[in-house]
Every structure is written in structure tokens, then in C-alpha cells.
Curated annotation (Swiss-Prot):
A Pfam family this chain is assigned to: Lactamase_B_2
Regions that span the bilayer: none
Signal peptide as annotated in the record: none
Family recorded in the similarity comment: Belongs to the UPF0173 family.
Lineage: Archaea, Methanobacteriati, Methanobacteriota, Stenosarchaea group, Halobacteria
Molecular function GO terms recorded: hydrolase activity
The protein, known as: UPF0173 metal-dependent hydrolase NP_2132A
Domain of life: Archaea
Keywords: Hydrolase
Amino acid sequence: MELTWYGHSTWHVSVGSTDLLIDPFFGNPKTDLEPSDLDSPDYVLLTHGHEDHVAHAGAFSDATLVATPELVGYAEDNFGFEDAVGGMGMNLGGSVECGDAWVTMTRADHSNGIETGYETSAGMPAGFVVSESEPQRASDAANTAFYHAGDTSLMVEMREVIGPYLEPDFAALPAGDHFTMGPEQAAIAADWLGADYAAPMHYDTFPPIEIDTDEFVDALNATGADAEAVVLDGDESFTLG
């Protein structure tokens, strides 16, 4: 599994011959790329409807959309998407096969609206676990899994459900504070999840979410977690598994 971070919450995940793009937003200072610089992915995954997560979704409307039904409906009307998983999207707790990958939609603790003033509901906010095989009740160390937490606060569900059941190997966690978890809470999340690697995201894009990533690294080390902090530069890749 190949992971690439394009800044903010935008990630590209390659599983076998399948390419997935999560929360496309290239108007952030961590990337030098424009949407036109990328090949169209097979799937676009949207965690929620805020502008900094869907701003460039329309540039990849040839892909199959993975999002809540409410957000799928909006994206079909406004971003030009014509295809969604299951014909209408998915919802929390569901798992769908996406080419060579499996995608499980997880809970996120955040607000969710779209358009100016956020007056249009985009359904429940979400995170995603992208894995090489379908999640099973029994532990499966051979199933490589990447967790994108979306925009969220620290949740007990990370410790009780996502960690023990979905077993993420790599966790991408919002750490910019103000709108989401800060570095300390993100470090606790990494510990609860039992991930091997944890990367901060959703930071340094706007003044309210500027942080020193050393705070995340230090906080993670202080938890005694087994997770290794991975602080990527924009457009940098990481091979998992």
C-alpha cells in the first residue's frame, strides 16, 4: 500500500492497481500540485462537506464517489459525479469493495454542512479505513490498513471499535486543534488505535490551526505507544506493508 499526503487532509492511497483520493483540496500551502497534475483516481472518498475537504472534488468527477448518501446527492448535482458506490453512497459502519481495496466508513465527531453558511446538510461526518481485504472479527495481521480519521475530536470509539476491530497499521490524524483534535489528543488517539505509524494532518493551512509538529511527536512518545510518528512533507509518499 502506497500513501501520499498532499497537505491538509488530502491523501492518495494505492492498493494493488486501485487508486483512491481522499478529501481533495489542493489550495493548501503544503502542496505544489494542482488537480490537473494528477491522474484521475478510481475512487474519490469524501469524509464530509466542508470546503477544505471537497474544494477540488469536481476535478475528479470521472471517479466513483464514496461518501454518505446526502453528500453523494450534493456532489452529483454540483460537482458532476455520475457514479457512486452502491449507486447512492454508503454510511457509518458499512464496508464496500473498491477494486483491490476495501473501504469501511467510521464515525467522526465533527460538524457537517456544505455551501456558504453550511445551510445544507451533508449527512454525518465520517472517517475511512482503507484495507487490503474485508475486515473480519478475528484479528488479521496480514491485512494492511490505513485509517483516515476525517475531522474529529478524540473518541472512545477509536479505542473500543476502530483499533481492536479494524486494526489500522497507519493512522492519519487531524492535529491542528481549534476545529479538531490538537497534538496531545491526536497522540492519545494513536495510542488507543494501536497503530504502528501515526501522521498528523489538518494543520498549518490557516492561522487557527498552525502548530509545531514536534508537539505531536513529543506527546506520542510520552504516551508510551508503539506507534512511530511520521511527519510527512507535502507531496511525500510512504510505503506501508
